[in-house]
Swiss-Prot record:
Belongs to the protein kinase superfamily. Ser/Thr protein kinase family. It comes from the Eukaryota. Residues 302-331 are annotated as: Disordered. It comes from Caenorhabditis elegans. Its EC number is 2.7.11.1. The lineage of its organism: Eukaryota, Metazoa, Ecdysozoa, Nematoda, Chromadorea. This is Putative serine/threonine-protein kinase ZK507.1.
Length: 331
């Protein structure tokens, strides 16, 4: 599908487009859920949507439904695969933990649970936004409040939701997920960024992975190597389905740890040490895409997994302020 087949003009900017076949059933349509989430946070003030990509427009053609949004850089999963943990400064990892956690806090503020927190669903910003980490992929999101503002009563039984490596223990038990579960998934993800040896259930069956997660929470309650893990594990383990998670408690655990390690959390995000930094001559595009870290965002992002149906315009993007453009149909 050409990006301008609906009659849009092409300009010199780039956006991202997510598509879905129009005949997808209402129950299987994740794009509509994503659109609802994006419309919800678009109404928030700037501070509360710092970690969300901007919704540019949405519509449908005879075959496709589509959403156009601001473009982002590589995902944390891609960066984890590309660089060794020793290449990433501790300050960057801790700031990554804080930003990804703040994104969850803001997501809950608009009334939704994400339910699929993992490194692949976080991306660093593109170009001038590369100091910001964005949360993406809201296809499994669910409202957790009723119209009167009360937390929805839990359903007696649900199915396992999320990615087995990072999903919460409640998801393994097929229980209704609450705000605590997004944070528990975030915790597994954060641990995996700090100390990859602790997440040792890759490739195991679901029951065995659940048992390993239970063991990890028990272990971390007396874990002295990274004291912040001890604080966070104890706090999260005491929450129940409808608990309101105190973001400040988790943030303070990380900032206290940084202070004890004499780390500043105001340095630029750097995804590898300068000794391994590619020179401009061997990293085309870095000057235009990422000044501080010299990451070639375009080359990494072009390898992104196709399962997310994320398409980039090679020549530009849609322009919505051309009076000659015909208005797309909505969905």
């Amino acid at each position: 599908m050409k990006v301008n087949e609906e009659g849009f003009a092409i300009d010199d900017k780039e956006y991202a487009m997510k598509t879905e076949l129009k005949f997808a059933s209402k129950h299987s349509s994740r794009l509509k859920i994503e659109r609802n989430v994006m419309e919800s946070y678009s109404k928030c003030d700037a501070q509360c949507k710092e970690h969300f990509s901007e919704l540019i427009d949405f519509g449908q053609s005879p075959v496709w439904k589509w959403i156009v949004m601001t473009i982002v850089g590589p995902s944390l999963e891609e960066l984890k695969m590309k660089y060794k943990p020793s290449d990433i400064p501790p300050s960057t990892i801790l700031q990554c933990g804080l930003q990804t956690m703040k994104a969850i806090h803001d997501f809950h503020q608009i009334g939704f649970l994400h339910r699929d927190i993992k490194p692949a669903n976080y991306c660093i910003g593109y170009g001038s936004k590369s100091e910001t980490i964005y949360v993406l992929d809201f296809g499994l999101a669910r409202k957790y409040r009723l119209p009167n503002g009360q937390v929805r009563p839990p359903r007696p039984k649900t199915k396992m939701i999320g990615t087995p490596r990072y999903c919460s223990r409640a998801s393994h038990r097929c229980e209704e997920l609450g705000r605590r579960d997004d944070y528990e998934s975030w915790f597994f993800m954060f641990i995996d960024l700090v100390d990859t040896t602790l997440i040792d259930w890759k490739g195991l069956t679901r029951p065995d992975a659940y048992a390993k997660k239970q063991e990890l929470f028990t272990k971390l309650k007396t874990y002295e190597k990274h004291p912040m893990f001890k604080v966070i594990s104890i706090y999260l383990d005491n929450l129940v389905y409808d608990s309101e998670v105190k973001f400040g408690v988790l943030r303070e655990a990380i900032t206290d740890y940084a202070r004890g390690c004499k780390l500043t959390l105001k340095e630029p995000l750097v995804w590898f040490n300068q000794s391994t930094c590619p020179s401009p001559s061997t990293a085309p595009g870095t000057g235009a895409s990422r000044m501080a870290t010299n990451i070639d965002l375009k080359s990494i992002a072009s390898d992104r997994n196709e399962e997310n149906s994320l398409d980039r315009s090679k020549t530009g993007t849609l322009s919505f302020n051309n009076s000659k453009n015909k208005k797309p149909s909505r969905y």
